Amino acid sequence: MDIIGGQHLRQMWDDLADVYGHKTALICESSGGVVNRYSYLELNQEINRTANLFYTLGIRKGDKVALHLDNCPEFIFCWFGLAKIGAIMVPINARLLREESAWILQNSQACLLVTSAQFYPMYQQIQQEDATQLRHICLTDVALPADDGVSSFTQLKNQQPATLCYAPPLSTDDTAEILFTSGTTSRPKGVVITHYNLRFAGYYSAWQCALRDDDVYLTVMPAFHIDCQCTAAMAAFSAGATFVLVEKYSARAFWGQVQKYRATITECIPMMIRTLMVQPPSANDRQHRLREVMFYLNLSEQEKDAFCERFGVRLLTSYGMTETIVGIIGDRPGDKRRWPSIGRAGFCYEAEIRDDHNRPLPAGEIGEICIKGVPGKTIFKEYFLNPKATAKVLEADGWLHTGDTGYCDEEGFFYFVDRRCNMIKRGGENVSCVELENIIATHPKIQDIVVVGIKDSIRDEAIKAFVVLNEGETLSEEEFFRFCEQNMAKFKVPSYLEIRKDLPRNCSGKIIRKNLK
């Protein structure tokens, strides 16, 4: 089923400007409280100016341009400005340090970088010491260093006409971006995403939360992440809705922002939901217009129920990954929830559970979650310049191996168990980290939790729990282990406990387990 009709991203923005004109398309709020608003017409003009800027700097169809930016209007301008001229965006996690950023520059073949002054010294060093194809840097800040090969993004953009000067032939099969995975267990891989992928993501995600043109979709997710781009931004723009991009997440400020912009849809990761729940209760907890909150793994049933009850919203499960572009398994609009199920496969997808020999398993049996889509259309096209890694996860007929374990019931509802790499082998038993984390998270003193396996000469692996406590709380080992013994099988009880101030996380809020082993 082709729901795109051959329309690439350039055509999308020209149509949106014509249809929605002066309706608000984008609102960006900086950490300092500065707010920028753009109508669909104004945003399309800014995108055109940005496309013209890149053209004047020698960027042509197929060239790669890296973005190392926090959430800001310039990210949106660049994303779609590059797409309009057939160039390819390479977003870089704004939290990455020198070595990781240099690695992505080298492996993406990016020849131009857009960043801010705070990151410039790092890239200046990379240019001097690393072999990259980077030949020019645009800074979004006003102040400029007196260096060759550096220019002001804003000054150059504002000098450009609001109509597009360079419009090469485009196809929905053309690559729009290369998004490098977070790489919690290995070097990140470049996920190739096409114009079709992004257009499909917009329509699919809008369907997922029944989005309309009078909706306001607010997100604090980082713009360089697939969730912000495909679940939020593309959904909002495809529906003609208003997209609100907040620079940084703050649990104290979040509900005020939701109320201020009259948001009707938002998205959350577990860390956000947990930190929102530990904020002091307020009479304004339900004084908002939110009807749906898209959320991503993992939350316990108790956490979900408590959040919905306190804030009066519906949580919509969305299971996916960078390679699937969108949440390919989730709660459908109007469906009743069947927690702890993660939902059913969405339209245009098939899903099944397979064993270690790649054979489908019957209902109730645990195996690998596999998804069937169309490469370059409903799932990613390939890993950039890495056919071996592509072949390892993507079959020729479109079946994608997620690396996650789960099972399915008789009615087609799927249940997530864990990442295969997060299964602990303890004395012949397989123990799911997620299962233990969901149990331990119910302890009233615990704010955040991660469980990992560590080497054990007798039982293969021992279980260690890292916890972050709620503010002002103390927790003894005796109390912790007693709680575990009362709530889980003996062989699942952790052997070790470490209390920390925080846990290491990547850009999407996922805990980096390798840093704890």
Curated annotation (Swiss-Prot):
InterPro entries: AMP-bd_C (IPR025110), AMP-bd_C_sf (IPR045851), AMP-binding_CS (IPR020845), AMP-dep_synth/lig_dom (IPR000873), ANL_N_sf (IPR042099), CaiC (IPR023456)
Family matches, as CDD domains: FACL_DitJ_like
Recorded superkingdom: Bacteria
Reactions this protein catalyses: 4-(trimethylamino)butanoate + ATP + CoA = 4-(trimethylamino)butanoyl-CoA + AMP + diphosphate; crotonobetaine + ATP + CoA = crotonobetainyl-CoA + AMP + diphosphate; (R)-carnitine + ATP + CoA = (R)-carnitinyl-CoA + AMP + diphosphate
Keyword Glycoprotein: no
Disulfide feature: none
GO molecular function, one term: crotonobetaine-CoA ligase activity
Recorded coiled-coil stretches: none
Gene3D superfamilies: 3.30.300.30, N-terminal domain of ligase-like
Alphabetical keyword list: Ligase
EC number: 6.2.1.48
Pathway(s) annotated for this protein in UniProt: Amine and polyamine metabolism; carnitine metabolism
Matching SUPFAM superfamilies: Acetyl-CoA synthetase-like
GO biological process: carnitine metabolic process; fatty acid metabolic process
Family indicated by similarity: Belongs to the ATP-dependent AMP-binding enzyme family.
Stated role: Catalyzes the transfer of CoA to carnitine, generating the initial carnitinyl-CoA needed for the CaiB reaction cycle. Also has activity toward crotonobetaine and gamma-butyrobetaine.
The protein's name: Crotonobetaine/carnitine--CoA ligase
